[in-house]
Structures are given as C-alpha cells and as structure tokens.
Swiss-Prot record:
The N-terminal domain is essential for RNAP assembly and basal transcription, whereas the C-terminal domain is involved in interaction with transcriptional regulators and with upstream promoter elements. It is an enzyme of class 2 (transferase). It comes from Dichelobacter nodosus (strain VCS1703A). It comes from the Bacteria. The gene is rpoA. This is DNA-directed RNA polymerase subunit alpha. It catalyses: RNA(n) + a ribonucleoside 5'-triphosphate = RNA(n+1) + diphosphate. GO terms for biological process: DNA-templated transcription. GO terms for molecular function: DNA binding; DNA-directed RNA polymerase activity; protein dimerization activity. The lineage of its organism: Bacteria, Pseudomonadati, Pseudomonadota, Gammaproteobacteria, Cardiobacteriales.
C-alpha cells in the first residue's frame, strides 16, 4: 500500500453487551478519523433516526394537566410522563390512535392498550398509573411518527384541542436512548498512530442497535455524497480536536436568554451551565421554588431550538 493511501476501516467486532445494547468496534482509522466519525454518528443517531411516540391523549374526567384523578395514585402530570416511556413500533403508519379501559384496582400498564393493526408496544410492562380501588379509567392516545424531539404546541383558550380536553405531550421520537463512543490506539504493521473507534448504543427496543448505526451511516452518506460532484476543490478543514463534551453544554445558562424569572430560579438551584440544565428532568425542575409550568415550557422551547432537551445523559459531565 502506498504511503499516501488512506486506510480503509472494517468492523472487527459487534458484541451484544446488554438488553437492547451493543458495542461496535471499527478499525483501523487514520489518526483523527475516530473522533470525526464518532461525533457525526452520535449526532445523527440522537437526532435523525425515525421513531414513534405518543403526542397527545385524553383521559376521561380530566380537563387539564394539573388535575388530580379520583381513585388514581398518580396525578395527571405523572401519568403523562409515564406515557412518554412507552416504546412504540409503527413501521407502516404515520399516525394512529390507541385506547385503554380498565376497572380493577392495581397497576395500569402499556399492555392494557387496545392496539390497531400496524402498531406494537415493545415494553408492555411499562407502568402508566395505579388504581387505588375498583373504578373505571379510560385513556385515548395519539401516536405519531417523527424524528428528533418536538415540543408540544401550546393551545389557545378557544382552540379545538382545549375544548375537547386534549392533553399534548412533548415527543421524543428517537428510538436511541443512549450513544457513547471512545477512540483508542490501533496498530497496523509498523504504524502505531492509528485510531480504533468503539461505539456503544442502547435503543428502546423498537430498533436493533446495529440497524440504528446502519441507518445513521446511510443518512450521513446521503447528505455528504453531494460534495462528490463538486468541480472546485474545497480547502481542507482542520482535524477535529479530541472533544469529550459538546462546547455548547459548557456555555452559561445566560446565553439561552431566558426571562429574568426563569434565569433567577435556575441560578438559585446552582444551575449555571447549559449542561447542568439539560441533565435535570421535568419533575426535578418543577420542584424548583417559583418555577412553574410556564417557565418550564419556556425552558423546553429554548432548549429545543438548540437541539437539546431535558433529561439528557451526558457522558463525562462533572458531578456537582
């Protein structure tokens, strides 16, 4: 092989390391290519793989999300948060409606839903709520297909969704729950300055982790192949540095330009960086003094504009 010829990597190992979790090892890569490919694949896997999620629901006897449900242990907000944990598979449909109706005391799970043809729930044991006594409980939910994260639209007081008691949910469509990568040193013959890319990916069970990587690579290929036909030669870009934490997450919360009320509430909780904020869950933020649902919606909308969301798992983030 000529000294100027780039090495062609190959997949040397695919190992299942847990439920819906796999580790893929790729080598050899030219120095710096491990971080280049790892960063690109990670971003695409988190933001661009198609999936399904519940986007709205109606609960009999409930008019708004701050209600308490008679005979139900959880309040409405907790029920909505539990609905987000349901992993749905809907390959041939864009939108579907699912229903459940129970009357007996005990746990209500995703397996209680009546599903139309073409819709599957892969975690039927997911708990939605608990009935404290024998009473009727009915819930209707809308499932939609999408990509990335979508903040629930805010309905006007006179809108149709408000009159019909529709509860809208923020939707995380990505079937990828966690993606992490690391780069180690590789060797080929006398060369020891090469990269080995190791990717660990966990899905919600609706997609095989290996298939998710293939889909991400296909998306990248389709986006980049347009440059192959360029006639002019572009300037070479510098190799990416070995970044372990996205610089955006290190920026102060003030850069989000939140309202004074929201910003002061976050500072009072020692939430100083964007990374500190996205690691918090909705439930945790709602426990913050003086931070209500309006401020929470503002925070979620601003984060969504930066392709971020609450409850993110950030690798290597320093613990407080």
């Amino acid at each position: 092989m000529a000294l100027t010829e780039l090495l062609t990597p190959r997949i040397v190992q695919i190992k299942e390391i847990g439920s819906n979790t796999s580790r893929v090892t790729l080598e050899p890569l030219e120095r710096g290519f491990g971080y280049t490919l790892g960063t690109a694949l990670r971003r695409v896997l988190l933001s661009s793989i198609e999936g399904a999620a519940i986007t709205e629901c109606q609960i009999d006897g409930v008019s708004h999300e701050y209600s308490a449900i008679e005979g139900v242990k959880e309040d409405v907000i907790d029920v909505l948060l539990n609905l987000k944990n349901i992993a749905l598979l809907m390959p041939d449909l864009e939108r579907a409606e699912i229903r459940l109706s129970v009357t007996e005391k005990g746990a209500i799970t995703a397996g209680d839903f009546e599903l139309p043809a073409g819709v599957e729930i892969v975690n039927p044991d997911c708990v939605i709520a608990h009935l404290t006594r024998d009473i009727p409980f009915s819930l209707t939910a809308v499932v939609e297909k999408g990509r990335g994260y979508r903040v629930a639209p805010q309905a006007d007081d006179n809108s149709e969704s408000t009159r019909s008691n529709v509860l809208r949910l923020d939707a995380s469509f990505s079937p990828v729950r966690r993606i992490a990568y690391r780069v180690e040193q590789a060797r080929v013959e006398q060369r020891t300055d090469l990269d080995k890319l190791i990717i660990e990916i966990e899905s919600n069970g609706t997609i095989d982790p290996e298939q998710a990587i293939r889909d991400a690579a296909t998306i990248l290929h389709n986006q980049i192949k347009v440059f192959v036909d360029l006639e002019s030669t572009e300037e070479e870009t510098e190799e990416e540095e070995e970044i372990y934490i996205d610089p955006v997450l290190l920026r102060p919360v003030d850069d989000l330009e939140l309202t004074v009320r929201s910003a002061n509430c976050l500072k009072a909780e020692n939430i100083n960086n964007i990374g500190d904020l996205v690691r918090r869950t909705e439930v945790e933020l709602l426990k913050t003094p003086n931070l209500g649902k309006k401020s929470l919606n503002e925070i979620k909308e601003v984060l969504a504009a930066h392709n971020l969301e609450l409850g993110m798992d950030i690798e290597n983030w320093p613990q407080n």
